[in-house]
Amino acid sequence: MAELTPMMRQYLEIKERHPDCILFFRLGDFYEMFADDAKLASHELDLTLTTRDRGKEKSEQVPMCGVPYHSAESYIARLVARGYKVAICEQMEDPALAKGLVKRDITRIVTPGTVIESSMLDESRNNYFACVFGEDGRYGLSFCDISTGAFYATQAEGAEAMERVISELGRFAPAEVLHGGDAAKSEELTRTLQERLSCCADLGADELFAPQETAQLVEKQFGKPLDELGLTERPEVWRSAGALLRTLCELQKTGLSHVRELEFYVSGRFMELDLSARRNLELTETMRAGEKRGSLLWVLDHTKTAMGSRMLRSWLEKPLLSPKRINARLDAVEELTKNSIGRDELVHMLQDVSDYERVTARIVTGAANCRDLVSLGNGCEPLPELRAAIGGLHASMFGVLLDELDDLSDLRDEIRNAIVDEPPFSVREGGMIRDGYSEELDQLRDIVSGGKGTLARIEAEEREKTGIKTLRVGYNRVFGYYIEVSKGQTAQVPETYIRKQTLTTGERYITPELKELERTILTAKDRITALEYELFSQVRQHLADQSARIQRTARAVAALDVLTDFAALAARQNYCRPEIDLSGELHITDGRHPVVEQVLKDALFVPNDTALDCGANRVAILTGPNMAGKSTYMRQVALIVLMAQMGCFVPARTARIGVVDRIFTRIGASDDLASGQSTFMVEMTEVAEILKHATSHSLLILDEIGRGTSTFDGMAIARAVLEYAADKKRIGAKTLFATHYHELTDIEQEIEGVRNYNIAVRKRGADIVFLRKIVPGAADDSYGVEVARLAGLPDKVVSRARELLRALESGAPVRTVRVAADDQISITSMENDALRRKLESLAIETMTPIEAMNALFELKKML
């Protein structure tokens, strides 16, 4: 193999340290990729694949492709979105000043969980990197969003530990997960990461989770001993947190000084929602299309700031269990709901607030440019007015927010004094610092501007001295400043001119005076560029030192934005304040589905009442036809409960919500082909999880249990599940149970606490009208054939279905009907059909005309 060039040797040495990354290797104005990286990148990014000499003898070529450094971000984003890791290798010194090969090193590794660039992130959601570590049946979970500085940790233990691990991962929806210890051995977790969470999963080496090292990392990062963090007796948590911190530091290279607070929480603080419940209730995206539109988040999120949008999603993912904390939010929402003028003023102010959290993260990590600083400065403008507005509000939560919210006027002024209003994108090319900010910079700029005046003076003097009227002074990068004289006038050039270049149209010369001026101007320009970067870096570092203030203000502004949004929604949609307590009761008057009523727009949504408690009204059996609205109603109840525990007003006339610890759903069915499970197996697995984990404080939404198997098997399973859920000694949870098994309605007479309800239907001849109203009692019919007709089944199929239904209801055997060539049903084939039997029983010979007409009318009714 040919001897490597110094640059290729340098590349391979760096690549060897990061074999799992695509290496973006900076060469001048480009990031280049070589060998296998180049082949992969050219395919993924549609780049032209070329070659470069690998060795000095030029006998061996290596594949190469590249992207301009100023547009690299978009290419990196595409690679990271597809799950690749990208290592950024920068030039660590100015190539013009380097002696020999330019020094290069990795400055950052970009992975799905470490993105901080605004163009690569969804501003409305956090971008979490998670870590799960397990030992002896106990698991520690940590979640960090380095784009905002948020850091959470929790634990899971006992028989339900893995279920809780998966539930928490579903709550945070991380972009990347690191797992180690017992967590790395869990097939269930591995399958969930791959199939249900669709996130990038990394296996952590055992040494990454070493107890002593991880404990020290956690204490150093958060500035507190483990006991003050509440982690002394939770080694699996600090080992998870420490491993995550170490991984992030290795990837970021610049440290995590903006990650200041570890928020440890326990399972009793928030409502539990498993992956099925989140999916079935369509909290953040719809089940079919995976879109925000049509989800609960779509209804709720009209926040004015990116920070508020992220906090609202967090509140949605973590509904509260404490009535005190819920009511504190509701008090604030109520005050703003009643104060429309104050609310509108807040909305107007919030529109001008920038994303402090993510700008601060870029500042601290050294990734912020001048435009980020200007955005931060401009975004601070509304803060004094926001403080004044909050000061006039009375709810206790506003007092807390006022204490947290800093007007940041000193930082705003510093940015405005230092940075021009419209700075360039690059921080290495000058043009950033405002005149008057630095005396030295102003002097250098005077030299450059004065030098331009001097050049004009020299040009005028030389024309006068030589008598050459077309003489001009110019500049190019090769020769610097020069005097150009046209060909016909070169005889007039004085001997003091030094010829540098011959052109077809003339000659170019230099003079000692011109070269001295050139050195002065170019030296000043270089110094200006370097000094501007120094001054910018000083401002950025000072802002980084103040990042704690900015982050506190960001959290306060985000909470204010969410509360204002909730109030505006309540006023706009006529929501009511729910009464929150620990009674276990669930009483809703004229409740509405928050999403459906907005999707319907002009159509009238029919409201419904709900009455559930832990006693005589524990279970509501809901019967009625498909398409009548059973599933919508049950989801509606669950969403109202969830919204109430977020601290939001709810779509109802009145609502009393006894706090619910978990919401379970079994709605819909689909095969899990990836794991080889049938519809019925998926259904039974989910039901088993519900019955295992539900408590008397839970809300169960069970739709069509048992429909995936035979009628009698399904009915038996549905009844057994219903009895188990209703039994106070086992669960006794508040339950909405929709079923087509009308035989189950008899349970109302057998088990205390079970009540029958149905969806009211009105028949108009052969047509049915769904009234969408929940009324007491069992349904008298499922109207399945009528629903099939409404769905558009062919008339012949519907007619045949009616015949078969009548035969089944009468207990007569059913046989296949032979079809004639003209598609008409053959009367001779209907040997046991009810219509045939009726015809055979008629004594036509003895009938009067009136009797014949009546008989014909009866026969027509049988069709």
Predicted feature locations:
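Charged catalytic and DNA/RNA-contacting regions of genome-maintenance
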Residues: M1-E335, H348-V364, A368-A460, E585-H587
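ATPase nucleotide-binding head domains, primarily ABC-like/P-loop NTPase cores
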Residues: A35-A38, R234, K304-T305, S309, ...
